[in-house]
Regions:
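N-terminal intrinsically disordered/low-complexity leader segments
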Residues: 1-8
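Basic, amphipathic "hinge/linker" alpha-helix immediately C-terminal to the N-terminal HTH DNA-binding motif
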Residues: 20, 72-95
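N-terminal helix-turn-helix DNA-binding core of bacterial DNA-binding proteins
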Residues: 10-49
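C-terminal interaction segments
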Residues: 165-239
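Basic amphipathic alpha-helical segments that dock to polyanions
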Residues: 53-63
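Amphipathic alpha-helical dimerization/coiled-coil segments
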Residues: 91-140, 147, 222, 226
Length: 239
């Protein structure tokens, strides 16, 4: 928890007392993708440093947002994971991420930090089409060196790091730019397949089309005046 406080009864201020320290929300962002070992959190957030990461994790534990756990066999390694209270941050933080999509990029933003799994994480907040809550499936994506999967549980998609632990309905491979264009509806699944920018390793074209029909970002409608003032981040999502 932050050592400084706004000292206000306002629930937004009290939330920031817990979440307002630099890096805290990004640590939570990584845990939204599933349980993580300390070294994997450090690799995902290289600029945070070992001591600061340990401090932020202690703060999240003290606040009841994250906890230590051990992965089941055969892994049986210590990890950090979100608690039920931590999971309650999923919707508000992903809504914040979607809001951030419309912020202009500047020279301080490193395009090399774009990650497909974080794009997918943001995409899960765009689901508007209902899906049968009885379906339990996974969809695996291999985007460059990044491997992640989308779980379909209780009618909702969740993005998770790494390969699917169960046999996926769909496994596809593509590059980061292609995935970005699919996510932003700048490219259709059928066109990506036609242009050989996507390879289906397992599954069907129908499954691929479904993912990007149910999950895809549509920019907000702007008036002519607003469009002139707003500068879209060129090239796609930077999560």
């Amino acid at each position: 928890m932050a050592t400084k406080t706004y000292g206000q009864m306002c629930p937004i201020a009290r939330s920031l007392d817990v979440l307002g320290e630099r890096w805290t929300i990004l640590v939570i962002r990584e845990l939204l993708l599933g349980p993580k070992r300390f070294k994997h959190l450090l690799a995902a957030l290289p600029a945070i440093g070992t001591n600061r990461l340990a401090d932020r994790l202690r703060g999240l534990e003290d606040a009841g947002i994250a906890r230590k756990a051990v992965l089941p066999p055969p892994a049986t390694v210590p990890v950090y994971e979100l608690t039920a209270d931590g999971e309650r941050l999923r919707d508000p933080l992903l809504a914040l991420g979607l809001w951030g999509l419309d912020l202009p990029l500047d020279d301080r933003v490193d395009p090399g930090t774009a990650r497909a799994d974080l794009i997918a994480l943001c995409l899960t907040a765009t689901q508007t089409e209902p899906v049968d809550p009885g379906r339990r499936e996974s969809f695996e994506f291999r985007v460059g060196d990044d491997v992640f999967h989308l779980q379909l549980r209780h009618g909702r998609f969740l993005a998770r790091s790494g390969p699917s632990p169960t046999d996926p309905t769909l496994t596809v491979a593509c590059d980061l730019q292609t995935f970005m264009e699919l996510a932003l509806r700048q490219l259709t699944a059928s066109q990506a397949l036609k242009d050989r920018r996507v390879t289906i390793l397992h599954g069907t074209r129908t499954s691929l089309a479904e993912v990007f029909r149910v999950l895809a970002y549509t920019p907000p409608t702007r008036s002519a005046g607003e469009e002139g003032e707003a500068v879209r981040g060129a090239g796609g999502i930077r999560c």
